[in-house]
Structure formats: structure tokens, C-alpha cells
Curated annotation (Swiss-Prot):
Organism: Gibberella zeae (strain ATCC MYA-4620 / CBS 123657 / FGSC 9075 / NRRL 31084 / PH-1)
GO biological process, one term: transcription elongation-coupled chromatin remodeling
Keyword annotations from UniProtKB, A to Z: Centromere, Chromosome, mRNA processing, Nucleus, Transcription
Superkingdom of source: Eukaryota
Subunit structure of this chain's protein: Component of the SPT4-SPT5 complex. Interacts with RNA polymerase II.
Any one of the GO CC terms: DSIF complex
Gene3D superfamilies: 3.30.40.210
Cell compartment(s), UniProt: Nucleus; Chromosome, Centromere
Record InterPro entries: RPABC4/Spt4, Spt4, Spt4/RpoE2_Znf, Spt4_sf
Protein name, per record: Transcription elongation factor SPT4
Main location: nucleus
PANTHER family linked: SUPPRESSOR OF TY 4, TRANSCRIPTION ELONGATION FACTOR SPT4
GO molecular function, one term: zinc ion binding
Length: 123
């Protein structure tokens, strides 16, 4: 993990989790860099409104992944194709309908909420 992932105790209240990939970063980092996994379709960088609607301050548990491709917990949490970092186990909140439609229609990505309300179909 790089030191850029370090969050001081005072910054903990500024942590947010992406509603799609569940990566946990400060709101300032989302503002400066966007989401390292979802930026292509979320466009969070330099967009406070998009950050507010596509990330959540309400999340449970944190997993630190150094090598997601080799981690069984990353596979179980559907994180194995993402960058190393801190990830929430559950993220509360609803992704806006327009973002969800864009994901499914333009990018062919099935959105599965990370709050545990829907389960992935194995079919």
C-alpha cells in the first residue's frame, strides 16, 4: 500500500465508499483522482455532485487488499478485478437511476448493490 492510502484519524469522517466497486477513499481523493476502478463510467473526478450521488458515507467493515487477484476474500466480495486498496464490505445507498441505466445500456455492466439487498445470480 502506498502512503497515499493513509488516512489520519481526523479524516475518518471524510471517508466515502464507491457504490459500484466499494473502494474507500476520502471525498477529496475522489475529487482529485476519481474512482480508480469506475472512473470510465462514473466521472467522479472534479464533480462534487457525482461524488455525492455515486459514493456513500455509510458503509460497514473495511478490507485492505494488497493483491486482489490472489485473494479469496476479494473473489468472494467481487473485488478481484480491481486495484489494490481499502474496500467496504457493505455500502448503503441507491445509485441514481440514470447512472444505473448508463451502466447497463452503454457498458453492459449488471449493477449489483453492495448493501446486501440483492444477490448475484449464478445462472
Amino acid at each position: 500500500m502506498s502512503s497515499s492510502n493513509y488516512v489520519t484519524t481526523g479524516q475518518a469522517r471524510n471517508l466515502r465508499a464507491c457504490m459500484i466497486c466499494s473502494i474507500v477513499m476520502t471525498s477529496q481523493r475522489f475529487q482529485n483522482e476519481g474512482c480508480p476502478n469506475c472512473e470510465e463510467f462514473l466521472h467522479l473526478q472534479h464533480s462534487p455532485d457525482q461524488i455525492e450521488s455515486c459514493t456513500s458515507q455509510v458503509f460497514e467493515g473495511v478490507i485492505t487488499l494488497a493483491n486482489p487477484t490472489k485473494s479469496w476474500i476479494a473473489k468472494y466480495q467481487r473485488l478481484d478485478s480491481y486495484v489494490p486498496g481499502m474496500y467496504a464490505i457493505k455500502v448503503s445507498g441507491q445509485l441514481p437511476d440514470d447512472v444505473r441505466s448508463t451502466l447497463e445500456d452503454e457498458y453492459r455492466i449488471q449493477y449489483i448493490p453492495r448493501d446486501g439487498t440483492e444477490v448475484e445470480n449464478d445462472a
